[in-house]
Every structure is written in C-alpha cells, then in structure tokens.
Amino acid sequence: YTLLCYKTPSPINAETCPPGENLCYTKMWCDAWCSSRGKVVELGCAATCPSKKPYEEVTCCSTDKCNPHPKQRPD
C-alpha cells in the first residue's frame, strides 16, 4: 500500500509516496511577502514528521490526500 499525498510546487497534485514514506505533511511559514501573499505552504510525503522550526507550522497525517493546500478546495 502506498499513500497519496498532495505535493508542492504547483500545480498541486496528489502523488503516490515512495515506499516507506507513510505520512503526508503540511508545512507553513511566513516569508518577505507574507503580508500580501499569505504564508508559504509546502506539501509532501515523509517517513517521519518533519521537525518544526520555531517560525513554522507543521502538521502530519496518514490518510490519502489528507494534506490539501489550505487555499485549495479538496477534490
């Protein structure tokens, strides 16, 4: 069984994760354009939940397509 996760960069598609990567993650942080564009969002697959830096928000989940882009409607 392989997991389906959304992956950035655009276009954001759900892709099959490589074997051994059984988590989807969403990572968000502010860059220089945060006030006009909002947070940067990175999506992908992981074997273990990525460690969170002080300025990041990181969430992980383990079901298919459980990490949609916050601004994207789930399909």
From Swiss-Prot:
Location, primary (coarse class)? secreted
Please list the disulfide bridges: 5-24, 17-45, 30-34, 49-60, 61-66
Q: Which GO terms describe its molecular function?
A: acetylcholine receptor inhibitor activity; ion channel regulator activity; toxin activity
Signal sequence coordinates: 1-2
Query: Which UniProt keywords are listed?
Result: Acetylcholine receptor inhibiting toxin, Disulfide bond, Ion channel impairing toxin, Neurotoxin, Postsynaptic neurotoxin, Secreted, Signal, Toxin
Tell me the compartments it is located in.
Secreted
Keyword Metal-binding in record: no
- Entry comment describing in which tissues the protein is expressed: Expressed by the venom gland.
Q: What SUPFAM superfamilies does its record include? A: Snake toxin-like
Q: Name one Pfam family in it.
A: Toxin_cobra-type
PROSITE patterns, sorted: SNAKE_TOXIN (PS00272)
CDD domains (UniProt xref): TFP_snake_toxin (cd00206)
Record's family? Belongs to the three-finger toxin family. Long-chain subfamily. Type II alpha-neurotoxin sub-subfamily.
Q: How does it assemble?
A: Monomer in solution, homodimer in crystal state.
Function comment: Binds to muscular and neuronal nicotinic acetylcholine receptor (nAChR) and inhibits acetylcholine from binding to the receptor, thereby impairing neuromuscular and neuronal transmission. Blocks muscle type nAChR. Also binds with high affinity to alpha-7/CHRNA7 nAChRs. In addition, shows a weak inhibition of neuronal alpha-3-beta-2/CHRNA3-CHRNB2 nAChR. Selectively binds to alpha-1-delta subunit interface of the mouse muscle nicotinic acetylcholine receptor, with a 10-fold higher affinity for the adult than for the fetal receptors.
Q: What is this protein called?
A: Alpha-elapitoxin-Bc2c
What organism does the UniProt record list as the source? Bungarus candidus
